[in-house]
Amino acid sequence: MPRYMLLLYAPEASAGEEAEREAEMPLWLDLTQSLKDAGLLVATDRLRSVDVATTVRVRDGTTEVVDGPFAVTKEFLGGYYVLECADLDEALAQAARMPLARYGSVEVRPVVDFEEVGPNA
């Protein structure tokens, strides 16, 4: 079955909004359990704040390490799900169930299966 990565992007939260997001944790736990029960969940994790991110670039043999994300953006990558879905339509339907879709965005990308396409995909 094809795999899809759901990348969860959220705007930076104010103190009040952060409390609201923490209050929705039971929704996330229920969603994750339902994905497990349906046999769709491959992996999921929440990422720490961009405040502790580090970006590494190598240019002309020189390694550059910079605190923070690669690009300044209004939304940050806060977590991900990897799901096994029958097709893109099912993956999109699951993305729409994410509580974050109401105030952020969920990017859905097919995952390359190297066993099917080989190492040159």
Task: Identify what each model region corresponds to.
Residues 1-121:
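Conserved, structured core segments of small domains
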